[in-house]
């Protein structure tokens, strides 16, 4: 049993979880966001999005100043009050975006894998793919430590592609709609554990953690949480955890921010 009155951290994915996958609406979650804010519970956004995108969304959601996890854990944006931490304002794990681009271009040219990265197109095309405005779409291209792409080849070739990436110290991660390439050393779980440890060091007590996500790339995050909400999502693969004890994990009946609200209701309203 736990409550929002005890030391608590909430980690949340964005698209398909806190935000509607199509409209990007978050209003169904607004009452809980306000309640968590009033209780001084940090809501830490955790996504495949770039830090530039997430800082914009963080401000829109009233969460500015808190830490966040970008690019599937390859980038940690530090909290405003953590200015004494080495690397402030951001910690980047693994090789850079430009280095990953070089690897992908070589694989495409020499081994003929078929894919389109966000670097291959302009913001108008990304806006068409995502439904974002062009100004918001431009923020999706500001990667620092990963590459987002659309796979346009066979499943057989994908297996070969993943094997080649792994040989080169990279990983291929499936999001709600796109695929992401990042350093094998990075991950939402490692980033979350680092943030949890930092809060513990600052307060002297390990906070209880609750994570919410809807896609396969959220599984590593949810695995390291004390409690997890798997929001009903669009991805056919879904989310599967090693420990799905009903006392720890809740699968929602609703999608997006309504599912987010349902998950918070489940764990807190009856407590």
From Swiss-Prot:
It is an enzyme of class 3 (hydrolase). NCBIfam families: HAD-SF-IIB, HAD-SF-IIB-MPGP, MPGP_rel, PRK03669.1. The keyword Metal-binding applies. It is found in: Cytoplasm. SUPFAM superfamilies: HAD-like. The active site is at residue 13. This is Mannosyl-3-phosphoglycerate phosphatase. Mg(2+) binds at residues 13, 15, 214. The keyword Transport does not apply. It comes from Escherichia coli O127:H6 (strain E2348/69 / EPEC). InterPro entries: HAD-like_sf, HAD-SF-IIB-MPGP, HAD-SF_hydro_IIB, HAD_sf, MPG_Pase.
């Amino acid at each position: 049993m736990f409550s929002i009155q005890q030391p608590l951290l909430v980690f949340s994915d964005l698209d398909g979880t806190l935000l509607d996958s199509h409209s990007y609406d978050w209003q169904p979650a607004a009452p809980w966001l306000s309640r968590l804010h009033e209780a001084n519970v940090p809501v830490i956004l955790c996504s495949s999005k770039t830090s530039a995108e997430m800082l914009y969304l963080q401000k829109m959601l009233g969460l500015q100043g808190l830490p966040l996890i970008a690019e599937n854990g390859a980038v940690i944006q530090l909290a405003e009050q953590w200015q004494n931490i080495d690397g402030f304002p951001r910690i980047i794990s693994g090789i850079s975006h430009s280095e990953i681009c070089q690897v992908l271009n070589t694989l495409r040219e020499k081994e003929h894998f078929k894919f389109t990265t966000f670097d291959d197109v302009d913001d108008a095309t990304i806006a068409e793919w995502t439904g974002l405005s062009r100004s918001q779409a431009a923020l999706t291209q500001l990667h620092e430590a990963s590459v987002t792409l659309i796979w346009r080849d066979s499943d057989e070739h994908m297996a070969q592609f993943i094997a080649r990436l792994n040989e080169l110290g990279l990983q291929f991660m499936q999001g709600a709609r796109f695929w992401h390439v990042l350093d094998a050393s990075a991950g939402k779980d490692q980033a979350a554990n680092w943030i949890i440890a930092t809060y513990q060091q600052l307060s002297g007590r390990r906070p209880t953690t609750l994570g919410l996500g809807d896609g396969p790339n959220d599984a590593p995050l949810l695995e390291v949480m004390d409690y997890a909400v798997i929001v009903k999502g669009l991805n056919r693969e879904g989310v599967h955890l090693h420990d799905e004890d009903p006392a720890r994990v809740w699968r929602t009946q609703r999608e997006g921010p309504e599912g987010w609200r349902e998950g918070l209701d489940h764990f807190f309203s009856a407590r």
